[in-house]
Amino acid sequence: MLLKTMTALGVLAGVLCAQNTRPEAGPFNASHLDMQPPPAQGVAVRAGRLFDPKSGKNLVNQVILIQGDRIADVGPAERVAIPQGARVIDLSRATVLPGLIDRHVHLIQDAQVNDGRAALTGLNYALKDLSAGFTTLQDMGSAFSYATVELRDAINKGLVPGPRLQVAGPQINPRGANYYPAPSAAMPFGLNTGYNNWQNTGNVNSPWLARAAVRDRSHYGVDWIKIYETEDYEGGGYPGQGGGAFTPDGKMINVPSLTLEENQAIVDEAHRRGLKVACHAYGGEGLRNCLEAGVDLPIHIIVGVTGAAGLDDETIRLLKKPMADGKPRQVQQTLWDLIGDLEERDLKASGGRATRFQLSEKSFKRLVAEGLEEVFGSGAYTVGHGMQAFQFGYFVKWGMTPAQALRMATSNAAEGLNFDLGRQVGIVEKGRFADLVAVAGDPLTDITETERVKFVMKGGVVFRNELK
């Protein structure tokens, strides 16, 4: 019955568009769903090639044994015996990868009439991502209350199918931030559902109100806190026509949203409650504030803390400073919101001197050269879900090896997830969740294979199989 109901969502009609346009997937294709629970005897997957993020190589002729939702064993076919009665899935002509992880999506960005509609809208986008091979998603802030928390819990309870989720709930911005329509409207921590603005993010005007915002989100059960640290689309308003992010002489405008003290309060309160903090900052003082406050994941990083193109030594020093727990800080750069009409607008605003996309390329290359660990986050929102993998091609074009690009969405991405989820996904090994993806070709020789996922398994359940 579930399959029949979901089939009504539509037929997949995604078409990859040309460079500098935003590719968009059609409705989720529920006809791909298998949804058969693994038999008591387990499942055996024959993998012709198995990508190993640790070595960056393909292991050939492998067998993956699955019991319930976990990997029971994995290794060469001559060592791993297939139990009698096990369901055998033959992917001997394909490349199998760990389930992909997208550490930056927005499942609910449109105004919704109520929380129920918001959750169903988010489910539709989450299923597109799952069908494309992304078995774990991190929602980096979705407006209109805490519907993503309810969606996460419904998936975990098996009420609806979907990827694994970690969610941030409503983003944190100060009152009067540029995402509000003018005049600014005071709203209690994003709970005004249906209000016609891009995101309801609160009334944070002091360190104590910043702590209160974190406590509120913790009460509702989020996994992460998301800060909007720079009002990066200043100069016309995103996504309105005519907006720009540059001065006429080509300098990027990055207005800090919060003070250092407010950031420190957010990070301290979040860490006290076992939550991690992600910070949207394109550069300048806002990026510096985030890093000095100790955020777990800085996002975007288009220019340096001084506003320098290609970053500067001070930015690299702050990024390399170990976290409070002694671990190195990961970084994330998204391309989604930089591809499309923003190129033309940025060129116009900067007098033809720069675009955010061009600056992102320079910064990406510097971060990789400095040895900082990049994690994949597409930035997909109301368009783009299910089409994220095209971004891997840019990373390879910018100097990464295909193996490095794949690590961004597997082992690297897993490592920074909150709680213990990171130790259960991202690598195909004994004891981890049986989250698998397969493509017909070899992404180590053609990274665009990731755009043509043919097989998806999450927790031992097949959600898509075009390799039968």
What are these regions (language model features)?
Residues K4-V15:
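Bacterial N-terminal signal peptides
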Residues A18, P23-A25:
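Boundary at the C-terminal end of the N-terminal hydrophobic targeting segment
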Residues P27-A30, M35-Q41, L50, G56-L97:
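Histidine-rich, glycine-flanked metal-binding segment
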Residues S31, L91-A111, G116-K251, V255-L275, ...:
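Divalent-metal coordination cores built from histidine and acidic residues
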Residues H32-M35, L50-V63, P76-A77, T401-L406, ...:
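Acidic, glycine-enriched loop/beta-strand segments at the rims
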Residues A111-N114, T148-V149, Y179, G236-Y238, ...:
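Histidine/acidic-residue-rich catalytic or RNA/ligand-binding cores of hydrolases
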Residues R272, R356-P443:
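His/Asp/Glu-enriched, well-ordered alpha-helical/loop segment
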Residues L291-P298, M323-Q330, G371-E373, M400:
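Glycine-enriched alpha-helix->loop->beta-strand junction motifs that scaffold or abut catalytic
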